[in-house]
Amino acid sequence: MNVLEAVFLGAVEGLTEFLPVSSTGHLTILEKLLGHDIDDPDITAFTAIIQVGAVFATLLYFRHDFRRLLAAWGRGVRDPAWREHPDYRFGWAVILGSIPIGLVGVAFKDQIETTLRSLWFVGGALILWSGVMGYADHVGTQKRHEEDVTWKDTLVIGIVQCMALIPGISRSGATMSAGLLRGLDRVAVTRLSFFLSIPALMAAAALQVLTKSDDIADGVGWPATIIATVVSFAVAYVAIAWLLKFIARHSYSVFIGYRLALGATVLFLVATGIVSAT
């Protein structure tokens, strides 16, 4: 992979990681169009590792929130009186909500990295989950806010987040849809989606580094991977700021329309043989 491709893919990762359009789906499509074998271990590892850039963008953007949550969590561990504090309960809720995707990701690791990366799955998932997003956006009451989030909310959202292991579903699209169906408002579910992303993405990247470091070195190359990660960080930071402002005033309709168009295009290209599915 050359530097220009790394910069391009890093920018796409940073832009799409937190938008409900599936960053992994986009990377899978683009890696295929750039001539890479999307089933190669080095390509699947590259796709997971560059998400770390988006994670660090989240940590930087929400640094004050994380500092507050960690302080409350630490006090709650030491002092039972703090255990009813909203920040303490929210911290535990995020931890609980992160467990399901870790368990499912490990259990189905081989299928996620091979079979599910087929463009048939990507295109179909983009279209099918658009219907779920549209339904959630339409029926969600949005009467509950971030301070109302409970461990039951994050557990349900965390279970639904497992669907995002299928490229094309979108981790943020899954968590936001589940949150809306739990009655949370758009800003609350968007912020919660950011918080839930950190354990999931860091664990996925760490697993790839530990198990496929040699594949990266021999294939894509660590220089290209590091460059893409840095670009992902910069673009993701801007995307986070934009999304929070956008979602406070608009529905998910623009993302749903985009997903439908992209999914239909992908399926057309594969069905006509213009692009192979794997």
UniProtKB/Swiss-Prot annotation:
Pfam families given in the database record: BacA
The keyword Cell inner membrane belongs to this UniProt entry's keyword annotation: no
GO biological process, one term: response to antibiotic
Keyword annotations of the record: Antibiotic resistance, Cell membrane, Cell shape, Cell wall biogenesis/degradation, Hydrolase, Membrane, Peptidoglycan synthesis, Transmembrane, Transmembrane helix
Subcellular location: Cell membrane
Membrane topology label: Multi-pass membrane protein
Membrane-spanning residues: 42-62, 88-108, 119-139, 187-207, 224-244, 254-274
Annotated catalysed reactions: di-trans,octa-cis-undecaprenyl diphosphate + H2O = di-trans,octa-cis-undecaprenyl phosphate + phosphate + H(+)
Record EC number: 3.6.1.27
Superkingdom: Bacteria
Coiled coil: none
GO cellular component annotations of the record: plasma membrane
Additional detail: Bacitracin is thought to be involved in the inhibition of peptidoglycan synthesis by sequestering undecaprenyl diphosphate, thereby reducing the pool of lipid carrier available.
PANTHER family named in the record: UNDECAPRENYL-DIPHOSPHATASE
Name recorded for this polypeptide: Undecaprenyl-diphosphatase 3
Organism field: Frankia casuarinae (strain DSM 45818 / CECT 9043 / HFP020203 / CcI3)
